[in-house]
């Protein structure tokens, strides 16, 4: 069988609200997540020896059983009952590692989709979603992608009602030497804000409904659709991380410097997920590129990597 290739896009958070703690110890979240066209590619081919092996073009990325690609492959094989199945997997890594962009989750979702096709298993989308939820909170979104409300741990998806896919773009920045532990960020959030956490499912649902239909979400949706300035993007982890991570403070300050007459003011500036990736939203890719050019010297002096990306309407997808 010929090689297969799966495209695995990154995501950003347009809204991240920490509601409280769940009985299972995870945080209950209310989010809006958005796929972007910065993507990894996962190449797959069957192996005759029944082994699952993974290689990556970035040697710092673990390729053992801790990698979500390997974990997804092993779970899919176990659920198939065909223990003789094997695969050689090669990851072309373009999404920054440890960046709050769900790169690892998207890679795991790509493995589920790619191996389901490569091995001819025929699992339906609902079954793949259930397996994705077992493996990681962001992975169900990475399967579907687009623009979605994400509730629970992030695994409960509700697509936003859009007449057409959003056409916005962004300037994304991250310091390559900095990463943020997601458990640390949530733990710190709990330490600082735990007294204000909601306690009951009824309270959680009130906040979900406010996000679905409240004035702030309607203002956010209107700005996204019309490419007009947005209300401040809420990320309850941003203040926690910004207080402790110097590069996040510096990066946010740099992105906020994108002002007339130097360049068009961004529609919004925020941190994605638990960071440390930061982004500024613009109405078009050309305007994001203009902002990048205007800030290039300062970004280089600060040691930041930068990418100009567009919103994407889909999650992981077979390319061949």
Can you say where each PLM-predicted feature lies in the sequence?
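Short beta-strand segments
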Residues: 7, 90-92, 143, 151, ...
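Residue-level signal for inorganic ion chemistry
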Residues: 14, 42-44, 69, 104, ...
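Short beta-strand-to-loop capping motifs
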Residues: 18, 46, 174-175, 280-284
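Solvent-exposed alpha-helices and their adjacent loops that cap or buttress functional pockets
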Residues: 35, 81, 133-134, 140-143, ...
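Glycine/serine-rich anion-binding loops at beta->alpha junctions
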Residues: 62, 90-119, 137, 268-282
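Contiguous, small/hydrophobic- and glycine-enriched helical/loop subdomains that border
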Residues: 85-86, 108, 112-149, 153-156
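Conserved, helical-rich catalytic subdomain that frames metal- and/or nucleotide-binding sites
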Residues: 144, 153-268, 283-286, 293-296, ...
């Amino acid at each position: 069988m010929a090689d297969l290739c799966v495209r695995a896009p990154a995501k950003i958070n347009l809204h991240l609200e920490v509601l409280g703690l769940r009985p299972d110890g995870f945080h209950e979240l209310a989010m809006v997540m958005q796929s972007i066209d910065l993507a990894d590619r996962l190449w797959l081919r069957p192996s005759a020896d029944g082994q699952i092996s993974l290689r990556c073009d970035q040697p710092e990325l673990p390729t053992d059983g801790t990698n979500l690609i390997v974990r997804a492959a092993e779970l899919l094989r176990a659920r198939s009952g065909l223990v003789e199945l094997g695969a050689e997997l090669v990851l072309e890594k373009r999404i920054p590692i440890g960046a709050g962009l769900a790169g690892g989750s998207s890679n795991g979702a790509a493995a589920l989709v790619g191996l389901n096709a490569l091995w001819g298993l025929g699992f339906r989308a609902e079954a793949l979603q259930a397996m994705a939820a077992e493996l990681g909170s962001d992975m169900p979104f990475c399967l579907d992608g687009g623009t979605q409300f994400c509730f629970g741990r992030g695994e409960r998806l509700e697509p936003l009602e859009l007449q057409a896919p959003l056409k916005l773009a962004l300037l994304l920045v991250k310091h390559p030497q900095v990463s943020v532990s997601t458990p640390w960020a949530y733990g710190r959030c709990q330490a600082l804000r735990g007294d204000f956490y909601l306690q009951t499912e009824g309270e959680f649902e009130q906040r979900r409904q406010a996000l679905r239909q409240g004035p702030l979400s309607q203002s956010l949706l209107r700005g996204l659709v019309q490419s007009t300035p947005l209300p401040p993007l809420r990320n309850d982890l941003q203040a926690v991380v910004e207080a402790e991570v110097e590069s996040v403070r510096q990066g946010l300050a740099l992105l906020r410097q994108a002002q007339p007459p130097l360049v068009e003011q961004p529609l919004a500036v925020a941190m994605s997920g638990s960071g440390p990736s930061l982004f500024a939203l613009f109405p078009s890719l050309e305007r994001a590129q203009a902002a990048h050019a205007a800030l290039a010297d300062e970004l280089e002096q600060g040691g930041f990597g930068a990418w100009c990306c567009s919103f994407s309407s889909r999650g992981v997808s077979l390319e061949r």
